[in-house]
Amino acid sequence: MVPLWFTLSALCFVGAAVLLYVDIDRRRGLGRRRKSWAKSHGFDYEYESEDLLKRWKRGVMSTVGDVTAKNVVLGQIRGEAVFIFDIEEVATVIALHRKVGTNVVVDLRLKGLKEPRENDIWLLGAIGPRMVYSTNLDAARRACDRRMVTFAHTAPDCAEIMWNEQNWTLVAMPVTSNRAQWDEGLRTVRQFNDLLRVLPPVPQNGSQAALPRRGGSPSRPLAPTPAGRRELPPGRADVPPARGDVSRFAPRPEAGRSDAFRRPPPARNGREASHFQR
């Protein structure tokens, strides 16, 4: 009896070793294929990234814990950053950066998949083979035009979940996806990103610029002008004239001319003015 148990234990050990070798070889093969695919597109490749997944929290990201992104590819599409990476045993994700961010989240996923786990997102309805969820149903309804309907029907089945977060648009595919499906995922995330441009942008804080100062040094700000008081031009004093002060109505003496002698005004029709007193 003892030899039988010993033989069974040995067989189990050999089987476990074979499965472990196959799994390691599969992972290495996936890494080699991903690296070769990245090189063919002019992208960069690294084996893993610890901080990459901290950028997102929705979609498939809400179902994983503190994990590390594997087989990470970094590149650019039309001047915008793009990441392709694996969440081990969960999904392969493609993330495309957006020029203009939005606070409205639109989640488009195949029917039959579990609904989003977030508490701030609601079901909008079905478009063909996919269900639409959003954090703003009115904005998402405006985005679901004819182009979105066509896209929902023609998007490949390998793009199981599509969603956006702030300045990113993401697509989740099966972790067993191949090179051809990665190319389809790139095209899909670009199309979905273009369709989401109609969403309201993130409001900009401090959009109103400060009023420029006049005649003041940056290191010495001007004192605020009291209410109801206007600035006067140079040479004018801001003192109201007294009621009995008639000097304000007196003509100013002309330069180079004495007050002792005043020339009479010119005569009209050859005669002197009768009202002028010498």
Swiss-Prot record:
InterPro entries given in the database record: Treh_trans_TtfA (IPR049724), TtfA-like_core (IPR049726)
Cell location: Cell inner membrane; Cell septum; Cell tip
Coiled coil: none
Residues on Periplasmic side: 1
Keywords, sorted A to Z: Cell inner membrane, Cell membrane, Cell wall biogenesis/degradation, Lipid transport, Membrane, Transmembrane, Transmembrane helix, Transport
Bilayer disposition of the protein: Single-pass membrane protein
Predominant subcellular localization, coarse grouping: membrane
Biased composition range(s): Basic and acidic residues: 269-278
Sequence ranges on the Cytoplasmic membrane side: 23-278
GO BP terms in the entry: cell wall organization; lipid transport
Region (Disordered): 200-278
Knocked-out gene: effects: Knockdown of this gene leads to cessation of growth and shorter misshapen cells. Accummulation of trehalose monomycolate (TMM) and lack of trehalose dimycolate (TDM). Accumulates MSMEG_5308 protein.
TM stretches of this protein: 2-22
Gene Ontology CC: cell septum; cell tip; plasma membrane
Domain comment in the entry: The N-terminal domain (1-205) is necessary and sufficient for proper localization and function of this protein, and for its interaction with MmpL3.
Function (record text): Required for MmpL3-dependent trehalose monomycolate (TMM) transport to the cell wall. Required for growth and cell elongation.
Quaternary structure note: Monomer. Interacts (via N-terminus) with MmpL3; active trehalose monomycolate (TMM) biosynthesis is not required for the complex formation. Interacts with MSMEG_5308.
This protein's name: Trehalose monomycolate transport factor A
Species, as recorded: Mycolicibacterium smegmatis (strain ATCC 700084 / mc(2)155) (Mycobacterium smegmatis)
Gene (UniProt): ttfA
